[in-house]
């Protein structure tokens, strides 16, 4: 913790370097990896390297070459990849962790097709991969394919109700609770919540955390302050207008950042000033969050760390307990939640048990 009471992340990320340099993460990656065939100007390269030096950025694994460069492979199986930025983030985490041991990552997208899953798992068994990560874009219960039992396997962002495999998911209830606590700590009492679609477990659990924080603070859970959205800007916009028509809240907690985008638009249409007259909190910490005006306070989904955890469990060689780890979701405090603070990441140091 710094002298001014703010808390900073322990490691500078490539995302922060890109923001500091005013370029994309892809550009930072190409510059740092020495891709001279890319048409990146000398000025852009200079800006990236300057940002790296000023922020003290060190790639994960820097100074720690692979223990033994080999040809081992971890198979990673997702139902979808292209529909979400979080899959690529988790894959990066797996690659970083696996490469420390000289192991590569092979990714397939199955579309949830059981026949395709079976074919891939048979191939990986023949290839004698180190293990398999079975993942889902949406946090949910799954019925893992039978052939997964041939492999050393873990589940990512999903869980097996029969507890046959170890799994890791975000601690969504605790994330929702912590976000609401930040709004309460900022002095807000009439705190509204815009949920996602009710069939999504993540949305339900974030709302449970919101309600838990209100009750713990002695505040009522008012049904009039809870409105269903759709995880899209359009849903956040429509839900915010409904909330304003029912009576002005002090703060609005949106169950994801995309709905917060629509919430911003609706508030500005009604003459409100985000972070001043009405506070807003998001969830996910998508790229757009830091570029909103004011920058959006939100909650980070730990997909990179989840990916690292999966690769580490596959490679550690010891038996993997068939339990579900709920990984902490840090609050990312910027300027929309009603406190005048510098951008800071507050890391919870525990995992959700409830």
Regions found by a protein language model. Give the residues of each.
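N-terminal helix-turn-helix/winged-helix DNA-binding helices
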Residues: 2-13, 52-86, 101, 124-126
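Flexible loop/turn connectors
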Residues: 241-354
């Amino acid at each position: 913790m710094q002298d001014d009471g703010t808390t900073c992340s322990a490691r500078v990320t490539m995302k922060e370097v890109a923001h500091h340099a005013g370029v994309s993460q892809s550009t930072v990656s190409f510059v740092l990896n020495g891709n001279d065939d890319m048409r990146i100007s000398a000025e852009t390269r200079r800006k990236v390297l300057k940002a790296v030096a000023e922020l003290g950025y060190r790639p994960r694994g820097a100074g720690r070459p692979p223990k033994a460069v080999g040809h081992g492979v971890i198979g990673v199986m997702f139902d979808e990849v292209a529909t979400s930025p979080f899959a690529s983030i988790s894959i990066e985490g797996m690659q970083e962790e696996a490469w420390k041991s000289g192991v590569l990552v092979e990714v397939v997208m199955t579309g949830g097709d059981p026949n395709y899953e079976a074919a891939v798992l048979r191939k990986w068994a023949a290839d004698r991969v180190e293990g398999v990560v079975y993942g889902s874009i949406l946090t949910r219960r799954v019925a893992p394919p039978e052939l997964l039992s041939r492999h050393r396997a873990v589940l990512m962002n999903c869980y097996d109700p029969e507890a046959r495999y170890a799994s890791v998911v975000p601690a969504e209830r605790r994330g929702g609770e912590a976000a609401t606590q930040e709004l309460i700590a900022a002095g807000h009492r009439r705190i509204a919540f815009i949920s996602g679609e009710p069939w999504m477990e993540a949305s339900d659990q974030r709302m449970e955390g919101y309600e838990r924080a209100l009750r713990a603070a002695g505040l009522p859970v008012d049904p009039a302050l809870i409105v269903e959205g759709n995880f899209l800007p359009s849903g956040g916009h429509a839900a915010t207008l409904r909330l304003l028509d029912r009576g002005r809240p002090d703060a609005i907690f949106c169950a994801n950042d995309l709905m917060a985008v629509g919430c911003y638009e609706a508030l500005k249409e009604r003459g409100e000033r985000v972070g001043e007259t009405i506070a807003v909190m998001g969830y996910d910490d998508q790229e757009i969050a830091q570029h909103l005006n004011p920058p959006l306070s939100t909650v980070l989904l730990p997909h990179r760390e989840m990916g690292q955890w999966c690769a580490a469990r596959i490679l550690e060689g010891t038996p993997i307990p068939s339990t579900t780890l709920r990984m902490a979701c840090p609050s990312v405090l910027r300027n929309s939640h009603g406190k005048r603070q510098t951008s800071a990441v507050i890391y919870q140091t525990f995992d959700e048990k409830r």
